[in-house]
From Swiss-Prot:
The protein's name in its UniProt record: V(D)J recombination-activating protein 2
CDD domains, per the entry: PHD_RAG2
Gene encoding the protein: RAG2
Subcellular location: Nucleus
Protein family: Belongs to the RAG2 family.
Function statement: Core component of the RAG complex, a multiprotein complex that mediates the DNA cleavage phase during V(D)J recombination. V(D)J recombination assembles a diverse repertoire of immunoglobulin and T-cell receptor genes in developing B and T-lymphocytes through rearrangement of different V (variable), in some cases D (diversity), and J (joining) gene segments.
Gene3D superfamilies: Kelch-type beta propeller (2.120.10.80), Rag2 PHD finger (3.30.160.290)
Subunit structure: Component of the RAG complex composed of core components RAG1 and RAG2, and associated component HMGB1 or HMGB2.
PANTHER family assigned: V D J RECOMBINATION-ACTIVATING PROTEIN 2 (PTHR10960), V(D)J RECOMBINATION-ACTIVATING PROTEIN 2 (PTHR10960:SF0)
Organism this protein belongs to: Homo sapiens (Human)
Length: 527
């Protein structure tokens, strides 16, 4: 195993815990950016170009018949082939959190339609499900099993907001483990069926799942109800005859206690588990090898990588599987330095790499026609993410040109900012105050100076006043700047004075010219 530090030369502020990586024919693509996509890359999907230990995020485009794909954190992803012999594969994306902390229940299918030297074109389609549709969730897993020449998606675990009937003002943003049901999803016809298995008693999230042929292994995970990381190991086998599918579960010994671990495949029947947590505030520094042979699973410890001091002393870490036995890891930067990075990134190679190190992309070294092992890399968001978002997600690189000058900086206009010295709005404890609020606080724009956003609740605004200000075009000043605004009296409008026209210095004559004959006639007339 080799650990190498890499530098992200652009768009480093977009990488955050909960992102996902997709590997298409050796090319790695980044998905799940921080904030909503901007005009530089409206798709939110980037090509992760690695060259000489430098990483560049290159924008990709969608085809005209594609649907919109929001940036999702902690979704369930897996590869999908029509059959085991098929060479082309697609990625299935289900659930996840949007930048507004809304949990998605949609399922998307990603495939590549065109590749050239400059940009990659994806086709993204939304799949509608009928039947026992899984509720919106995140931190779960989805895998594909193959049996009797047919394929089926298997979805399990995750967390979601409490049902609307159980949500109270004090616990409006509280989450709970989803019921321990196993969902079978037919991607061809869009049918979903749920199964209740007696062996699965408690809900799990941020677990590791491995799929091979008709079998899925689930190990580790975190139970929110009991606040434990059980060392369970489940084997779920799916049989797909002509009639109804048969699903059975077996509890196996030899599991490990870990959550938010990353799984990567090193060869046909061997996988490596990296990272994760064994306690709420303790990282799991050891790695394990998982071998799948003859319908058996074997878990054993392996040589620990030479972790750097920064990784050892970091409270959190996160990452995703790049494919080909390589893991992309990130840790928070050092906030004590004057100029600090938001995150530091590393590449951990768990498999022997015989390819040239100067190669720009990773080549797929898998020779098996079976579906590669699927895992969903996660980070315990309730335990680590929200604390990291407050001080670590605003890191920016000096070469980062992603944020255009004419667009607002989301780190300054977010809903969870400290709007004033007395602001007490916290993402973990906030509850709706106005009837118009649902899952984020109402805000109003202060027109003082360059302007800034404040929480309406912190300004003690009545709901009627808030609605009136939101509907009108009147300027609003927050409690801190209202006295300054009152002191700046605008002078009353004065009508301009009518200036009399300037008189000519010489008095003009009548304009009549008397000839000498007329003068003589007038002289004789009056005489």
């Amino acid at each position: 195993m080799s650990l190498q530090m890499v530098t992200v030369s652009n768009n480093i502020a977009l990488i955050q815990p909960g992102f996902s990586l997709m590997n298409f024919d050796g090319q790695v693509f980044f998905f799940g950016q921080k904030g909503w996509p901007k005009r530089s890359c409206p798709t939110g999907v980037f090509h992760l170009d690695v060259k000489h230990n430098h990483v560049k995020l290159k924008p990709t485009i969608f085809s005209k018949d594609s649907c919109y794909l929001p940036p999702l954190r902690y979704p369930a992803t897996c590869t999908f082939k029509g059959s085991l012999e098929s060479e082309k594969h697609q990625y299935i994306i289900h659930g996840g959190k949007t930048p507004n902390n809304e949990v998605s229940d949609k399922i998307y299918v990603m495939s590549i339609v065109c590749k050239n030297n400059k940009k990659v074109t994806f086709r993204c389609t939304e799949k509608d499900l009928v039947g026992d549709v899984p509720e919106a969730r995140y931190g779960h897993s989805i895998n594909v099993v193959y049996s009797r020449g047919k394929s089926m998606g298997v979805l399990f675990g995750g967390r979601s907001y409490m049902p609307s009937t159980h949500r109270t003002t004090e616990k409006w943003n509280s989450v709970a483990d989803c019921l321990p049901c196993v969902f079978l999803v037919d991607f061809e016809f869009g049918c979903a069926t749920s199964y209740i298995l007696p062996e699965l008693q408690d809900g799990l999230s941020f677990h590791v799942s491995i799929a091979k042929n008709d079998t899925i292994y689930i190990l580790g995970g975190h139970s929110l109800a009991n606040n434990i990381r059980p060392a369970n190991l489940y084997r779920i086998r799916v049989d797909l005859p002509l009639g109804s599918p048969a699903v059975n579960c077996t509890v196996l010994p030899g599991g490990i206690s870990v959550s938010s671990a990353i799984l990567t495949q090193t060869n046909n029947d061997e996988f490596v588990i990296v990272g994760g947590y064994q306690l709420e505030n303790q990282k799991r520094m050891i790695c394990n090898i998982i071998s799948l042979e003859d319908n058996k699973i074997e878990i054993r410890e392996m040589e620990t990588p030479d972790w750097t001091p920064d990784i050892k002393h970091s409270k959190i870490w996160f990452g995703s599987n790049m494919g080909n036995g390589t893991v992309f890891l990130g840790i928070p930067g050092d906030n004590k330095q004057v100029v600090s990075e938001g995150f530091y990134f590393y590449m951990l190679k768990c498999a022997e790499d015989d390819t040239n190190e100067e190669q720009t992309t990773f080549t797929n070294s898998q020779t098996s026609t079976e579906d590669p092992g699927d895992s969903t890399p996660f980070e315990d968001s309730e335990e680590f993410c929200f604390s990291a978002e407050a001080n670590s997600f605003d890191g920016d690189d000096e070469f980062d040109t992603y944020n255009e000058d004419d667009e607002e900086d989301e780190s300054e206009t977010g809903y969870w900012i400290t709007c004033c010295p007395t602001c007490d709005v916290d993402i973990n404890t906030w509850v709706p105050f106005y009837s118009t609020e649902l899952n984020k606080p109402a805000m109003i724009y202060c027109s003082h100076g360059d302007g800034h956003w404040v929480h309406a609740q912190c300004m003690d605004l009545a709901e009627r006043t808030l609605i009136h200000l939101s509907a009108g075009s009147n300027k609003y000043y927050c409690n801190e700047h209202v006295e300054i605004a009152r002191a700046l009296h605008t002078p009353q409008r004065v009508l301009p004075l009518k200036k009399p026209p300037m008189k000519s210095l010489r008095k003009k004559g009548s304009g009549k010219i008397l000839t000498p004959a007329k003068k003589s006639f007038l002289r004789r007339l009056f005489d």
